[in-house]
Amino acid sequence: MVKFAKSKLKYFDCLINNASIFENDKLENFNSSSWEKHLSINLKAPAILSREFGKNIKGKNNNIINIIDQRVFKLTPFFFSYTLSKTGLYTLTKTSAMSLAPRVRVNGIAPGPTIKNKRQSKGHFRRQYLSTLLKKQVDVEEICSAVDFFIKNRSITVQVISIDSGQSLNWQTPDVLKGKE
């Protein structure tokens, strides 16, 4: 995939790992199928793409930006397989930055409530983002601005920015509220 993209694009100096699966499970009820899907899509694919990007890219001003999740900073027992795969992606961000420097800078973005997931009602999503410190939904453009920031700042690597309206610090998670996500 990396070789194909490089052959088709005039400039290819940035890989953004954004694909993700987000299914709810817990330690008590996760199954092998969901576990494998989460690890394959959320961690294995970015690892392989990052490896191939590092092998096939020239020059020094190259970037990998991993879209992680604020959940890596505010752990809950919900979305067990998803959270483990995203904490793995967080670690991949750090370790691949060390491996690929100085040719490739690797950073991450940990968004909060940006888009309503397919299982949520509009009301539940609204309650979710209103429970953040800033009481607002994250705008996709704010995430795009962070991508632009990482690309333009050549001295930044191994950083993960939370763009989560303060969710990772103050979100009233279901485990705290004794509720159900």
PLM features: residue spans?
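Hydrophobic positions on the long internal alpha-helix
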Residues: 1, 16, 49-53, 57, ...
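Active-site loop of short-chain dehydrogenase/reductase
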Residues: 11-13, 56-68, 102-104, 159
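Conserved NAD(P)H cofactor-binding loop of Rossmann-fold oxidoreductase domains
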Residues: 18-23, 166
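Substrate-binding pocket helix/loop in short-chain dehydrogenase/reductase
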Residues: 26-27, 34-36, 128
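Catalytic loop of short-chain dehydrogenase/reductase
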Residues: 63-88, 93-101, 113, 167
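Conserved Rossmann-fold SDR core element
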Residues: 90, 100-114, 156-163
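C-terminal substrate-recognition "lid" of short-chain dehydrogenase/reductases
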Residues: 140-163, 168
